[in-house]
């Protein structure tokens, strides 16, 4: 299969979290097309597993979808060069008030490949040690703890 070739990328908007770009592409047939693209510096997410096997989740407001969500702790990298393991450890403590010396890589997700280059490295944290939350001024997070079975029920009922 022949590749598409990007011949130009114009940065239309440079925000704090995202860059909005317009790419000029040549298709394998030689046709020139334009695609909008969101560039993201990357993120990390972490599944905090308590000593009894339950998982700490965060409930927070998500403006883009106008509702509260139940999710694992996650956040954007401070810079494009920040290692995602460092980001995951930071987000774990900031959002949950727990830290861990045993954080293991699980997988990389690309949640919106049709229009974004965002990648989220997912980790699992064990041997949690209680500290305290360090929320950003605009973050309002409630912690909720669930068994794996309870989370599966929430996924199957479209609550997550």
Residue ranges and their predicted role:
Residues 9-11, 108-112:
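Short, solvent-exposed loop/turn elements at beta->coil junctions and helix N-caps
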Residues 9-45, 51:
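Acidic, metal-coordinating catalytic segment for phosphate/diphosphate chemistry
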Residues 1-7, 31, 68, 114-115, ...:
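Nudix hydrolase/Nudix homology domain
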Residues 35, 44-90:
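Conserved Nudix-box catalytic region and its N-terminal flanking loop in Nudix hydrolases
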Residues 5, 99-106:
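A short coil-to-beta-strand element that immediately follows conserved catalytic motifs
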Residues 21-29, 112-131, 144:
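Active-site-adjacent beta-strand/loop module that shapes the phosphate/pyrophosphate-binding cleft
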